[in-house]
């Protein structure tokens, strides 16, 4: 029954205890007619989400579709899923993002542009050659953390091919309306120490 937010009532939600994360969860549960106070919050220290939910049927975990859900599929672990952005489009925020120092951007704009051009080239290679890109990642892992997860890496890369650019004009482009919708909500809910305001915190000026 955890295929809808209200179904989290009486269950255990594994949280990173981030104010924004918890406010988003509260929003979708209440929007679905649920009572957020009936969702038990416990600290999230899980590293293998698929195995955790297999062993703990009452657990709900915030995961990345392109990794954890694919891992669950590979390991044949049945799961209920809730896609937050489908329930509230405001929560379709950009993740991950590249962060730069304002003074650096002002003083060395050409370096920033060159860095983004090189980064774009790498992403485009991954889009055009997902299997090769996955193998490069596997071969470059000198920590051993990906050992035994080679198939997961490859299937994840196949999924991410359609996510790197998605509906954007080009790689790296940030749609102001989409950006503002989320951070206006953060401002409205007073979830950050300072308000951001419209069209702040991002730039498309350094993209080729």
Regions found by a protein language model. Give the residues of each.
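A general structural signal for short secondary-structure boundary/capping elements
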Residues: 40-44, 57-63, 86-90, 143-149, ...
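Short helix-capping segments at alpha-helix termini
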Residues: 31-36, 75-77, 143-145, 191-193
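Secondary-structure end/capping motifs
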Residues: 107-189
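Bilobed "Venus flytrap"/periplasmic-binding protein-like clamshell domains
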Residues: 1-75, 90-93, 180
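Residue-level signal for threonine
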Residues: 101, 175, 203-205
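Pocket-lining segment of extracytoplasmic ligand-binding domains
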Residues: 48-52, 56-143
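Conserved C-terminal helix/tail region of periplasmic/extracytoplasmic solute-binding proteins
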Residues: 179-208
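Short linear loop/turn motifs
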Residues: 86-87, 151-159, 196-207
């Amino acid at each position: 029954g955890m295929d809808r937010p209200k179904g989290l009532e009486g269950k255990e939600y594994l949280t990173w205890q981030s104010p924004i994360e918890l406010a988003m969860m509260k929003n979708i549960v209440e929007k679905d007619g649920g009572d957020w106070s009936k969702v038990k919050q416990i600290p999230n220290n899980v590293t293998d989400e698929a195995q955790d939910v297999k062993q703990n049927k009452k657990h709900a975990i915030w995961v990345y579709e392109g990794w954890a859900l694919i891992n669950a599929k590979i390991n044949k672990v049945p799961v209920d899923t809730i896609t937050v952005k489908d329930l509230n489009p405001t929560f379709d925020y950009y993740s991950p993002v590249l962060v730069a120092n304002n003074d650096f951007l002002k003083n060395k704009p050409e370096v920033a542009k060159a860095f983004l051009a090189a980064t774009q080239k790498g992403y485009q290679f991954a889009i055009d050659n997902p299997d090769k890109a996955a193998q490069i990642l596997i071969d470059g892992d000198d920590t051993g953390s990906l050992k035994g997860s080679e198939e997961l890496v490859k299937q994840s890369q196949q999924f991410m091919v359609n996510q790197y650019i998605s509906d954007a004009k080009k790689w790296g482009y940030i749609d102001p309306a989409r950006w503002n919708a989320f951070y206006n909500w953060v401002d409205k809910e007073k979830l950050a120490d300072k308000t951001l305001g419209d069209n702040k915190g991002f730039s498309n000026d350094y993209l080729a």
